[in-house]
Structure formats: structure tokens, C-alpha cells
Regions:
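A short alpha-helical cap/connector motif
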Residues: 4-5, 9-180, 184-258
Length: 258
């Protein structure tokens, strides 16, 4: 008998084995890539592990923060205290109230007074405590700011020697001092403010760095706080003041402990 040639005629189908073999290889490669991506082997119908409570909370807080900042016309620009606009997150305004009631300062220094909404709010809190006054500085002298016997406005840069000296002269011996920084939020400026004003705050009181949420466009208040705390053991970030979850001042509620 002659040998049978292993050929396929022009009108015959080619065997499927090579095709199936190639498909199987591609499938296995895809599975391997998927396993490497997920970091573990799993069945296609295996449920994903449930998210932790902290992960769920973080996602919800981030979602709220995004909504809050994307809708400033109905949030930041539409927040009032007794008819006057206050550019503050209400949750943070409440924390200020708790701090001032728990440990009332004699002097609250504010950098970045703008139209005086926050100063007016602080003055109302001091009225209820029957003590305290506000020293606040802004680059521009706005004429339509609220007038209150507890508020003294200064015009100039918060980091100028003249303004700092004016504040120091206004503080009487033995007075308790609290400071909140809410002017230029770029890192270099905030860090300079921290270096200048940290010595004015009395032990047990707060140095608040406002708007410390990280800015993707430039180093800001958060980076200033991080650098400041590395070199100053007199302060700690009081995380208990972030109890509501959302704050515009993360790591910014600095308490002087020594």
C-alpha cells in the first residue's frame, strides 16, 4: 500500500484543532491578565469583597465635598448669619462656636476679613459669652463692612511687620489669644503666617488654618500645615474638631499644647 498523504483537498474543511487550540491560549492569557490585575484568583461569578465602613464613608464625604464646591452659588455664596453673608462651611462655623464656648479667648485674630461676615459671626458668639474682641486684617478697606464694638479692622498684608506689631500692641498682658488664618491660601503665604502668628496663641487655644483641602493646581494651606508641624512640636492637629466628617479645614484645627 502507498502512504496516505496528510493533506486537505481544495473542497475539504481544515481541521478545527489548531483553531480551538489558539482560542484556548488566548482565553487562558486573558484570565491570567485579569488575575494579575485584581491581585488574586477568582471565579467569574465570585462576588467582590464588601467595602469597609471607612471606605463607604470616605466615598460619601468626597461626593458631598464635590457637590458642595461645584455648587458654590447655593452653598458658599448663599450662607448667612443673621442676614449677613458668611463664607464658611456651616459645620466649621459650628466648630468655631464650640471652641469659643469651651475655652473663650479674650482676643481672636483673623487674617482675611474680606467683607467682615466671619468677624460679625465671631462678634455675635463673643456677645453671648460676654467677653472677647476680634482683630481682623484685609488688604482692602471695604466701606460696607459691619460695625461692631468688638471688631477692630486693620488694612494691610497679614505678613507685614506693621500689621503684626499692631496686633501685638492690641493684646493686653495675660489675655488668651486664638488665631484663624483665612487670607491668601498659597503655601508660602500660609507658612509665613504660621511662623509669625503661632507664638501669639496661648497654650490650650487654637491656631486655625482655613481652606486646607489640597488644591490640585498649586501647593496650598495643607502643604504649609504639614511643613509647619514637622518643625513645631508646640502644636498638634486636633482631629476631634473634624467630627462631622466634612470640613474645609482638614488638619487645620491646630491646638497649642505647650
Amino acid at each position: 500500500m502507498g502512504q496516505v498523504e496528510d493533506t486537505v483537498g481544495p473542497n475539504q474543511r481544515k481541521p478545527l484543532v489548531p483553531v480551538i487550540g489558539m482560542g484556548l491560549l488566548l482565553f487562558l492569557a486573558g484570565v491570567a491578565i485579569g488575575q494579575a490585575w485584581n491581585g488574586r484568583w477568582f471565579r467569574a461569578d465570585e462576588p467582590r469583597p464588601p467595602k469597609s465602613e471607612s471606605e463607604i464613608s470616605a466615598e460619601r464625604i468626597e461626593g458631598f465635598m464635590t457637590w458642595y464646591y461645584e455648587n458654590q452659588q447655593t452653598t458658599f455664596s448663599n450662607t448667612y448669619w443673621r442676614g449677613m453673608r458668611v463664607i464658611k462651611v456651616p459645620l466649621d462655623a459650628w466648630i468655631f462656636q464650640e471652641i469659643i464656648h469651651e475655652n473663650p479667648p479674650d482676643v481672636l485674630i483673623e487674617t482675611g476679613s474680606y467683607k467682615g461676615g466671619s468677624a460679625n459671626y465671631f462678634a455675635s458668639l463673643f456677645d453671648m459669652e460676654k467677653r472677647g474682641r476680634i482683630l481682623t486684617v484685609e488688604l482692602e478697606n471695604f466701606t460696607d463692612r459691619p460695625r461692631h464694638p468688638r471688631i477692630t479692622y486693620f488694612t494691610g498684608s497679614s505678613v507685614s511687620p506693621e500689621i503684626l506689631q499692631s496686633f501685638k500692641k492690641s493684646i493686653r498682658p495675660g489675655e488668651k489669644v486664638m488665631v484663624t488664618l483665612d487670607s491668601d491660601h498659597h503655601k508660602d503665604h500660609v507658612l509665613k503666617e504660621l511662623q509669625l502668628y503661632s507664638s501669639l496663641v496661648t497654650v490650650g487655644d487654637y491656631l486655625v488654618v482655613e481652606d486646607s483641602i489640597k488644591n490640585p493646581n498649586y501647593p496650598g494651606a495643607m502643604e504649609a500645615v504639614e511643613e509647619f508641624l514637622k518643625n513645631n512640636s508646640n502644636y498638634v492637629a486636633d482631629k476631634s474638631r473634624e467630627k462631622f466628617g466634612f470640613t474645609a479645614n482638614p488638619n487645620g484645627w491646630l491646638k497649642r499644647i505647650r
